[in-house]
Amino acid sequence: MAWIQIRLNSTNERAEAISDFLEELGSVSVTFMDSQDTPIFEPLPGETRLWGNTDVIALFDAETEMQPVLTALRQSGLLEEGFAYKIEQIEDKDWEREWMDNFHPMQFGKRLWICPSWREIPDPNAVNVMLDPGLAFGTGTHPTTALCLEWLDGLDLTGKTVIDFGCGSGILAIAALKLGAKNAIGIDIDPQAILASGSNAQANGVADRLQLFLSDRQPADLKADVVVANILAGPLKELYPVISQLVKPKGDLGLSGILKTQAASVCEAYAQTFELEPVAVREEWCRITGKLA
């Protein structure tokens, strides 16, 4: 069976109302997506967490006349004047198979691979992390995650303790453990991230070496040889006193989730106590690394 798909750009404040309205107009399915691949966690019961700039995607039966749908949307007041939209015909497919086919093993640095569980491992002798998209995003596809994974791959983590601040799926902490770290600690504000990290650690056989804490319950004396934080520039600057205190003397720090235009202000904050290295850039994103002076 074929479908007609309409994709509308919206804000997170209006996305749910638009979704409800489209269902009233006869949509059989409505989903939310972010074109910039920004990480987001699965919502808690009764909660819908969205990106600041959200695309609303609705499917209609192929026989649906879309002009009345567009007219109703214009008259609803839910979208800005001259709102952007795209309508296209979608052929029926095995959507689960299609989704799975889009994820492939990815290499980061010289040793590290991130592999979906349903794919064959390209190099059994490499450091392989098995991770599937699921409870929390963070699978290596976003430039910031890739930058952090490559940085960890380039460090000698043998016998060291690593803190993954804002752990999400736990991908960075798990990768660090597989790369030789003795122990890792994951910290996040979201309980769903803690669950996801624990599940992924279990699947990779490293759960016994990973401690997980909600940020308001982390021990006051936490310290690590390596601290990595892949969040956003604003929180990185605000949390400078917290993050910098987590790093042991002569320890390593890696920060990402930072746009190129924001790098200077983040560097200014952390240069107070860290000897910073040249900024690494990928697409519009960058990574800041340094050693505690």
From Swiss-Prot:
S-adenosyl-L-methionine binds at T145, G166, D188, N230. CDD domains: AdoMet_MTases. One of its GO terms (cellular component) is cytosol. It is found in: Cytoplasm. Its EC number is 2.1.1.-. Belongs to the methyltransferase superfamily. PrmA family. PANTHER family: ELECTRON TRANSFER FLAVOPROTEIN BETA SUBUNIT LYSINE METHYLTRANSFERASE. This is Ribosomal protein L11 methyltransferase. The gene is prmA.
